[in-house]
């Protein structure tokens, strides 16, 4: 995907919200996966219009990986209640696992044991999730 991502029509969002859904994911310029260099950022104008149209309904931000922290916190302030960052978790998992193998740790002792080989990736995901929870303001909330 190139460019800025799709932006939802606020009235279509209201129509969907009126069906009784619990939470709504609306495009505000976000993209799944890694963002291209020419990405223009989130459309806060669209987000504000969607929020006005749907009222108290919590909003989801798909494609949260790679969005600058200041844009994430602004999106939260405008009604985003759930942010998906799975690509970011996958990237840190792969990086940590790759490092373990490139350092030859899988060849030492029982380093090939999946419980050992995958542990750095698991720990990298834990650290990333903790970082994101702090950024999102979700620590200590159910």
Model-derived features: positions:
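Short, hydrophobic-biased amphipathic alpha-helical segments
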Residues: 114-117, 121-135
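Flexible, glycine/charged-enriched surface loops at secondary-structure junctions
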Residues: 106-119, 138-142
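Short amphipathic helix-turn modules centered on a small-residue break
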Residues: 103-108, 126
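Structural detector of well-ordered beta-strand residues that form the stable sheet scaffold
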Residues: 60-62
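Alpha/beta enzyme core
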Residues: 1-57, 69-85, 91-98, 103, ...
